[in-house]
């Protein structure tokens, strides 16, 4: 997403692009299987019937991950204030450090930011199956002398619609109120959302 980053930081524009960038055509995700923070299955079906905001990171991340999760908690509050149905959105933190981040630990971690946030992880192969579909690469860096390592990962938040289609991406840094306003416009005008509302 270098081109999106470039657009947001082009000094000649003088105006930032929207924090939430949606795609002209949505791409259906292929099946994947992870484990959620209650040791249950987290798969493509877990993303259907609601809008999902997905962030990849790891618990030992010193800055980007806690900051983004906190910002997403603010995004959620702003969305609810705009009348968006809480049951129709979910925020998912997926750990790309399965060697250290276990289900119970992930659950405590995400619930600190919001009690309804969902955590998940899986093997490197399982994670790669999903991250490649979303264009969210990750890589464990070499260990230091004291056996500590970092994980390089995307800082973006990925939006999947209630049909399991990759719909857009939130480019940091972002303002919670702006993201909520942009998503509210999408939510209220989207044909997928309208179909869900009719079936409720």
Predicted stretch roles:
Residues 29-30, 51-52, 154-156:
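Short loop/turn microsegments at loop-to-beta-strand junctions
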Residues 114-117, 132-140, 151-158:
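Structural micro-motif
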Residues 42-72:
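Short active-site neighborhood of thiol/selenol oxidoreductases, capturing the structured segment around
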Residues 36-37, 161:
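Short, acidic, Ser/Thr-enriched surface-loop or helix-capping motifs
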Residues 58-59, 94-99, 124-125, 136, ...:
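Solvent-exposed coil/turn segments that connect beta secondary-structure elements
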Residues 143-200:
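Thiol-/selenol-based redox modules, centered on thioredoxin-like
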Residues 69-130:
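Structural microenvironment flanking redox-active thiols in thiol-disulfide oxidoreductases
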Residues 1-31, 200:
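N-terminal targeting signals for export/organelle localization
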């Amino acid at each position: 997403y270098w081109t999106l980053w470039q657009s947001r930081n082009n000094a000649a524009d003088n105006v930032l692009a929207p924090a939430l960038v949606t795609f002209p055509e949505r791409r259906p995700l292929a099946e994947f299987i992870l484990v959620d923070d209650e040791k249950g299955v987290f798969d493509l079906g877990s993303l259907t019937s609601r809008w999902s905001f997905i962030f990849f990171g790891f618990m030992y991340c010193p800055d980007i991950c806690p900051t983004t999760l906190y910002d997403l908690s603010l995004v959620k509050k702003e969305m609810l204030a705009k009348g968006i149905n809480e049951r129709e959105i979910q925020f998912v933190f997926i750990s790309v450090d399965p060697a250290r981040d276990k289900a119970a630990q992930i659950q405590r971690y995400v619930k600190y930011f919001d009690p309804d946030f969902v955590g998940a992880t899986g093997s490197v192969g399982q994670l790669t199956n999903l991250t490649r579909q979303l264009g969210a690469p990750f890589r464990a860096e070499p260990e230091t002398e004291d056996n500590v390592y970092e994980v390089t990962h995307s800082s973006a938040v990925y939006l999947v619609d209630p049909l399991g289609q990759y719909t857009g991406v939130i480019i940091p840094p972002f303002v919670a109120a702006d993201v909520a306003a942009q998503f509210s416009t999408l939510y209220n005008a989207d044909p997928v959302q309208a179909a869900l509302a009719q079936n409720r």
